């Protein structure tokens, strides 16, 4: 058999033409230090701030410091197997979290991974952790109410959709309870998506909250983002941004209204301080880094109400801050107070005296919520604030004098009754029309002759009576959002009719 050279050359040419080379270019570096949840990596040219890095063993990290000869990264998982000299690969991707309707009813960690044992989450929507907040042109003013179901708040510190309202107070005085009641109150309409971000809380507490939401039927429209106390600081730092990224998917892509709760931003700031000090950033006041204000302002500025041209959705943010011994002039509390559109101040003395929710009406304020309040609530809330202010002023003097004139006694009596009316149990949010008739009966003096210890009982029975015999009055307030003359006359008649049957 003779081999012809031209055949061999033809075969070789064909093989060469068919050959395809695939060159994969990776940006790689090596670990020069690892420990305390952070790593320093040498040789990553062109790394971006916030970029995702892949370490050996599948652990991911996020770039936070870009320095002259290395990058500082925080590690998002187990790092005991990572050692000096290990290869690190830059992914070229910014940190993202899954989003969309598939997340509803689930408990996820700060990376958006499910931790509730209900299987994987199937979603194609992803959102970047960091995003520039919407500008002035795309926003519109706050005009729609966000009902919390709590009389003390919906009347005196009203919250509108798209607002940022701070809940501030000492530990264990009902801050989280207000936030949870606000979520549970949405179960009737279910037109508000709720996201509860737990930062640095006990796992048992989060399990309890999830169980309560399931029991109350609130989990259908809620996502819980949990970064527990046992998790590394980077995950605690990321959790609020993950929550607001999920909220933006609903607001921008679907035009929906979202309520997001950050519980709490004090622990968030502490986690950021820990990371910053480990990354050797210069410390400032209370050892917080210089950009701790920006940490919270860029988060809370992402809450807004979009105009109809951009979908008309909204994000309402309720950040929580824990104070030490009522000190609202500390660093983090003053920062967040200046960023938000008002604050609900909870007082330990009121809580211990049995006034729950312990909202201090004098120190609490809502800067933009007033324009979102319904006319019916506005008509009773003005008198309510006045009655409480006069009562607080007189109650201090009444402790010293026994012989008070009739006008002073009448004001004290009215204040006591109104204070009783504002009491409300946990997990018992109330529809706005029932709140209005309760407060109306208090501020217009119909409870002045009811003993103080019977006011709560009177209110419960009176609302049952209104639901059964005077549902038309409640429906009129609900549908029109105001109390017209005809409705008011019916309401007065109903109050007097019930009072005649109420056994004191």
Swiss-Prot record:
Its EC number is 7.1.2.2. It is a peripheral membrane protein. The keyword Transferase does not apply. It is found in: Cell membrane. ATP binds at residues 169-176. InterPro entries: ATP_synth_asu-like_sf, ATP_synth_asu_C, ATP_synth_asu_C_sf, ATP_synth_F1_a_nt-bd_dom, ATP_synth_F1_asu, ATPase_a/bsu_AS, ATPase_F1/V1/A1_a/bsu_N, ATPase_F1/V1/A1_a/bsu_N_sf. It comes from the Bacteria. Keywords: ATP synthesis, ATP-binding, Cell membrane, CF(1), Hydrogen ion transport, Ion transport, Membrane, Nucleotide-binding, Translocase, Transport. Its main location: membrane. Belongs to the ATPase alpha/beta chains family. PANTHER family: ATP SYNTHASE SUBUNIT ALPHA, MITOCHONDRIAL (PTHR48082:SF2). Produces ATP from ADP in the presence of a proton gradient across the membrane. The alpha chain is a regulatory subunit. This is ATP synthase subunit alpha.
């Amino acid at each position: 058999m003779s081999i012809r050279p031209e055949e061999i050359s033809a075969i070789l040419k064909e093989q060469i033409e068919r050959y395809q080379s695939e060159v994969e270019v990776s940006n790689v570096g090596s670990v020069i230090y690892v420990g305390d949840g952070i790593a320093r990596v040498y040789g990553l040219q062109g790394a971006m701030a916030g970029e995702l890095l892949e370490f050996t063993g599948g652990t991911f990290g996020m770039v936070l410091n870009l320095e002259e000869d290395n990058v500082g990264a925080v590690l998002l998982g187990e790092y005991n197997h990572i050692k000096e000299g290990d290869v690190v690969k830059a992914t070229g991707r910014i940190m993202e979290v899954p989003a969309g309707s598939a997340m509803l009813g689930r408990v996820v960690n700060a990376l958006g991974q499910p931790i509730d044992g209900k299987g994987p989450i199937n979603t194609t929507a992803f959102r970047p952790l960091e995003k520039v907040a919407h500008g002035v042109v795309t926003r519109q003013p706050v005009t729609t109410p966000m009902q919390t179901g709590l009389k003390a708040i919906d009347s005196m510190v009203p919250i509108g959709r798209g607002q940022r309202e701070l809940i501030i107070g000492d530990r264990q005085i009902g801050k989280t309870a207000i936030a949870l009641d606000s979520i549970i109150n949405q179960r009737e309409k279910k037109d508000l998506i709720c996201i509860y971000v737990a930062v640095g809380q006990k796992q048992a507490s989060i399990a309890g909250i999830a169980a309560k939401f399931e029991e109350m039927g609130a989990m259908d429209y809620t996502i819980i983002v949990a970064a527990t106390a046992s998790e590394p600081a980077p995950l605690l730092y990321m959790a609020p941004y993950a929550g607001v990224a999920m909220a933006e998917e609903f607001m921008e892509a679907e035009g929906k209204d979202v309520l997001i709760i950050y519980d709490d931003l004090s622990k968030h700031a502490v986690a950021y301080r820990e990371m910053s000090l480990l990354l050797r950033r210069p410390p400032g006041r209370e050892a917080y880094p210089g950009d701790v204000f920006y940490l919270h302002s860029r988060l809370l500025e992402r809450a807004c109400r979009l105009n109809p041209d951009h979908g008309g959705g909204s994000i309402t943010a309720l950040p929580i801050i824990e104070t030490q011994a009522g000190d609202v002039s500390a660093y983090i509390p003053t920062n967040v107070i200046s960023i938000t559109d008002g604050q609900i101040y909870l007082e330990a003395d009121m809580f211990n005296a049995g006034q729950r929710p312990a909202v201090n009406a004098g120190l609490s304020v809502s800067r933009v919520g007033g324009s979102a309040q319904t006319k019916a609530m506005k008509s009773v809330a003005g008198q309510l604030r006045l009655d409480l202010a006069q009562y607080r002023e007189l109650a201090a003097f009444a402790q010293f004098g026994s012989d008070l004139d009739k006008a002073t006694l009448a004001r004290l009596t009215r204040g006591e009754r109104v204070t009783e009316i504002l009491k409300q149990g946990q997990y018992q949010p109330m529809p706005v029309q029932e709140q209005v008739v309760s407060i109306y009966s208090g501020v217009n003096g119909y409870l002045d002759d009811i003993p103080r210890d019977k006011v709560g009982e009177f209110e419960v029975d009176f609302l049952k009576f209104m639901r059964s015999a005077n549902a038309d009055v409640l429906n009129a307030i609900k549908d029109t959002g105001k109390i017209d003359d005809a409705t008011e006359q019916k309401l007065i008649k109903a109050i007097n009719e019930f009072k005649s049957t109420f056994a004191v």
